[in-house]
Amino acid sequence: MSTHFLGKVKFDEARLAEDLSTLEVAEFSSAYSDFACGKWEACVLRNRTGMQEEDIVVSHNAPALATPLSKSLPYLNELVETHFDCSAVRYTRIVRVSENACIIPHSDYLELDETFTRLHLVLDTNSGCANTEEDKIFHMGLGEIWFLDAMLPHSAACFSKTPRLHLMIDFEATAFPESFLRNVEQPVTTRDMVDPRKELTDEVIEGILGFSIIISEANYREIVSILAKLHFFYKADCRSMYDWLKEICKRRGDPALIEKTASLERFFLGHRERGEVMTY
């Protein structure tokens, strides 16, 4: 099932602003920072134990418990309890993406025995923010709730000075994400996803592959970051970055970089062990 728009929530702007102010000074976790190019952060509001320190997602089958930070955010808690089936909630996190940051194209839950159903509620966004799934690009608007098929290759980015904040909720797995909604304004028509990106020409591709002249261990991470962002501007599948990177390293003829790229693609798209962290 592909990502799609589910409905919309009308915010109490004053109460939301109070909780967002609390989050501005809250401590965000560095868990999953190896998935980020730039500043991507998360903090846990509900999890398996209710302990703030538990910031890695694991399989479990009980309703999530509120963390200490969650208890200091009364309006966000009210939003969860009013608009979602809390008995099916397994994790609730705030995800903040800052200026010129993106998530490396990846699939989620690869390290877990069971998967979840993931919904996003947009708390703060702007026109410089976008999400991608395979070859599609879309913008999640303020107050909107989206189902994200986290098993499909996807990415997210913020190309503005104002960070993007989403409330990200993992529920027990189901084929019907709409069943988790409560008191939500339902969409009347199907949302059209307009693709504003440029065409990916042969000239652009050769320019990308030109990194083969300079790529090295010293700049590998920076080149990965550039490649991860390109599909937000050109009509390409988010997975294309791995094809480009493999060809760049092949042209360079460096066995260590070729091996590193194979490991990178395996970790983000194929398989990763529980607790495994990618360094590159």
UniProtKB/Swiss-Prot annotation:
InterPro entries: Asp/Arg/Pro-Hydrxlase, IPNS-like_sf, Pro_3_hydrox_C, Pro_3_hydrox_C_sf. The keyword Cytoplasm does not apply. Its cofactor is Fe(2+). Binds 1 Fe(2+) ion. Inhibited by metal ions such as Co(2+), Zn(2+), Cu(2+) or Ni(2+). Is also inhibited by EDTA or diethylpyrocarbonate (DEPC) in vitro. Unlike the procollagen-proline cis-3- and trans-4-hydroxylases from mammals, does not necessarily require L-ascorbate for activity although it does increase the activity of the enzyme. Would be one of the most promising biocatalysts for production of cis-4-hydroxy-L-proline (cis-4-Hyp), a compound which was clinically evaluated as an anticancer drug. One of its GO terms (molecular function) is 2-oxoglutarate-dependent dioxygenase activity. Optimum pH is 7.0. Keywords: Dioxygenase, Iron, Metal-binding, Oxidoreductase. Dioxygenase that catalyzes the 2-oxoglutarate-dependent selective hydroxylation of free L-proline to cis-4-hydroxy-L-proline (cis-4-Hyp). This is L-proline cis-4-hydroxylase.
